[in-house]
A protein has these predicted regions:
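Long, solvent-exposed, polar/charged low-complexity segments
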Residues: 32-33, 45, 53-120
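Soluble extramembrane domains of integral membrane proteins
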Residues: 1, 23, 41-59
Length: 120
């Protein structure tokens, strides 16, 4: 999904998937296990990195059942949520170009959302 939070001193842009239900989370993890290179390309792309530094969200301490700790994308598989997040200053929120920043961030996030929802 897409999320815009506006609050003095605490505004941010986010989205992705926040604590998805177990069947969805399992489907996302299976997708990462099968095609984690694509997810890595998305979160390392220039467009994505223009707005977001990576993915935020809680992780399991150990791999979920059925996944090897040696899997090349195990750190992504251990995630419970998949959240891009960009903090915003109050001056950014009131800037005339703010709408363009939000639209740009949401466009940069779309490939991530597409990846997360494929197969759900």
């Amino acid at each position: 999904g897409y999320y815009l939070h506006i609050e003095p001193g605490q505004s941010f842009i986010s989205g992705g998937s926040y604590i998805p239900p177990s069947p969805w989370l399992n489907a996302i993890r299976e997708r990462i296990a099968e095609d984690g290179d694509t997810l890595q390309k998305i979160i390392n792309s220039r467009e994505y990195r223009k707005y977001f530094s990576g993915l935020e969200g809680e992780k399991l301490k150990v791999p979920p059942r059925g996944f090897s700790r040696d899997h090349p994308h195990i750190e992504l598989i251990k995630m419970k949520s998949f959240l891009p997040e960009k903090s915003l200053t109050d001056s950014e929120v009131i800037d005339p170009g703010f709408f363009n920043v939000v639209v740009g961030a949401f466009r940069a996030m779309k490939p991530l959302n597409d990846f997360l929802t494929t197969g759900i």
